[in-house]
C-alpha cells in the first residue's frame, strides 16, 4: 500500500502492473510480491473508506512519529514525573475537508468474521495514533478506522 500510486485508475491490471514495477525498482522482493493479494487491494479501493482515501487531496502513508506521554497514562503504577517516548508508524492518514481520517490496515485472521475482537485489541494503538496525528498536523481527527483485509471491512475506532 505504501508505494501504490492511488491517483491512477486502480483496476486489477493496473495494481498488478504497479506491483511488478515495485519489484523492478527493488521496492519489493519477488518473495514479498508472492504474498501481495491483488484482488484484496482492488476490493479495498471499492469500499467507502478506499474511495475516500483515493479522493483526498492529501494522503500520508507509512508516517513515523515519536510523542512524549506521561508514564501514568500508560501504566498508573508508574511515577507521575516519568515520561515515556511512544513511537510508531501510522499506515495512513488523509485529509477530508479540514479534518483528518486515520486508517490502519490489518491482515490478521478475524475469527468468526467478528471485528469486535480486532477493535478491542487495537483501540489503544489507534487512539495513540490519533493523539500523534493531531500534534503533527494541528488538525482535528474526524475518524479512525481499521481496515480488516481478512473480512474486507472497515471498522471505526472511537
Describe the role of every protein-language-model region.
Residues 1-158:
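Structural signature of nuclease core domains in nucleic-acid processing machines
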Amino acid at each position: 500500500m505504501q508505494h501504490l500510486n492511488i491517483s491512477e485508475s486502480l483496476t486489477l491490471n493496473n495494481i498488478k502492473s504497479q506491483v511488478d514495477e515495485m519489484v523492478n525498482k527493488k521496492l519489493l522482493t519477488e518473495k514479498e510480491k508472492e504474498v501481495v493479494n491483488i484482488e484484496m487491494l482492488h476490493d479495498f479501493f471499492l469500499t467507502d473508506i478506499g474511495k475516500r482515501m483515493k479522493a483526498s487531496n492529501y494522503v500520508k502513508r507509512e508516517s513515523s512519529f515519536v510523542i512524549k506521554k506521561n508514564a501514568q497514562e500508560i501504566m498508573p503504577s508508574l511515577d507521575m514525573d516519568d515520561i515515556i517516548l511512544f513511537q510508531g508508524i501510522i499506515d495512513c492518514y488523509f485529509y477530508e475537508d479540514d479534518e483528518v481520517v486515520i486508517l490502519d490496515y490489518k491482515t490478521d485472521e478475524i475469527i468468526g468474521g467478528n471485528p469486535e475482537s480486532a477493535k478491542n485489541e487495537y483501540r489503544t494503538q489507534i487512539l495513540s495514533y490519533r493523539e500523534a496525528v493531531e500534534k503533527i498536523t494541528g488538525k482535528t481527527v474526524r475518524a479512525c478506522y481499521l481496515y480488516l483485509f481478512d473480512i474486507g471491512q472497515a471498522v471505526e475506532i472511537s
